[in-house]
């Protein structure tokens, strides 16, 4: 889905890592939530509360989920899930556009 209808967008941005990662929150009528964002090249570790589905819309990164020893290359058009109460590290290789869905 390339666009969302009938949603509320939170005006204030979510800024991480001194501005290298930024997103905006999108709230849906059914109570679900997504963030749409952009990541500059660099290495970033995030922790999760809820489980997440990360869709990489464009760009390229290397991914390591908590407990994994190796890295996986993820590119535009691919996605990955992160369990609740976990963490993941990304080595972003090129500017990457993403959509993060919070799963219940």
Curated annotation (Swiss-Prot):
Keywords: Glycosyltransferase, Transferase. Its EC number is 2.4.2.1, 2.4.2.2. One of its GO terms (cellular component) is cytosol. Gene3D superfamilies: Jelly Rolls. It is an enzyme of class 2 (transferase). It catalyses: a purine D-ribonucleoside + phosphate = a purine nucleobase + alpha-D-ribose 1-phosphate; adenosine + phosphate = alpha-D-ribose 1-phosphate + adenine; cytidine + phosphate = cytosine + alpha-D-ribose 1-phosphate; guanosine + phosphate = alpha-D-ribose 1-phosphate + guanine. InterPro entries: Ppnp (IPR009664), RmlC-like_jellyroll (IPR014710), RmlC_Cupin_sf (IPR011051). It holds the Pfam family Ppnp. GO terms for molecular function: guanosine phosphorylase activity; purine-nucleoside phosphorylase activity; thymidine phosphorylase activity; uridine phosphorylase activity. SUPFAM superfamilies: RmlC-like cupins. It comes from the Bacteria. Catalyzes the phosphorolysis of diverse nucleosides, yielding D-ribose 1-phosphate and the respective free bases. Can use uridine, adenosine, guanosine, cytidine, thymidine, inosine and xanthosine as substrates. Also catalyzes the reverse reactions. Belongs to the nucleoside phosphorylase PpnP family. PANTHER family: PYRIMIDINE/PURINE NUCLEOSIDE PHOSPHORYLASE, PYRIMIDINE_PURINE NUCLEOSIDE PHOSPHORYLASE. This is Pyrimidine/purine nucleoside phosphorylase. It comes from Trichlorobacter lovleyi (strain ATCC BAA-1151 / DSM 17278 / SZ).
